[in-house]
């Protein structure tokens, strides 16, 4: 591999760190903002140079279309991470939240799963998400009405069906014993951590 300039090395480290912490590469705009570029175009030129040197692969047509070649990926842990207790203010995929890795092909889910979450409680039992199940989650930051999401409300992580009306979000259970969680975005914090894309029943397949 051809040697990197200091700026290229800085961008490559930023990409690796972002993937490790959030499960996703940064956008061009995020790279530009974090490293002080005047525009996303400046970041794009550095990304093209990194691609020519074989450090990254660029997938056209998507703002996060950056991936590390296989030899650049950290293979010390493989498979899907099972996320345990999530610390306040920390990314859900931060390494300290990972309890263990399961050898499950992420592509068996659609969209591809990025992590697993153990289900607590029976609030989603009517759609087959039960206590103790492993929920496969695709990492996203936005959701559409009707989707089942993993959401963080004031640092509590919950699995619910998403509905947004104006500046208010309702997180609906799939169990008549539970009332919706109402989140007024004007003064409450809500983070979408991902979409539910599959369920592994109480450790089946593992």
Curated annotation (Swiss-Prot):
Transmembrane segments: none annotated. Gene3D superfamilies: Umud Fragment, subunit A, Winged helix-like DNA-binding domain superfamily/Winged helix DNA-binding domain. The record marks 88-89 as: Cleavage. SUPFAM superfamilies: LexA/Signal peptidase, Winged helix' DNA-binding domain. One of its GO terms (molecular function) is DNA-binding transcription repressor activity. The keyword Zinc does not apply. GO terms for biological process: DNA repair; DNA replication; negative regulation of DNA-templated transcription; proteolysis; SOS response. HAMAP family: LexA (MF_00015). This is LexA repressor. The gene is lexA.
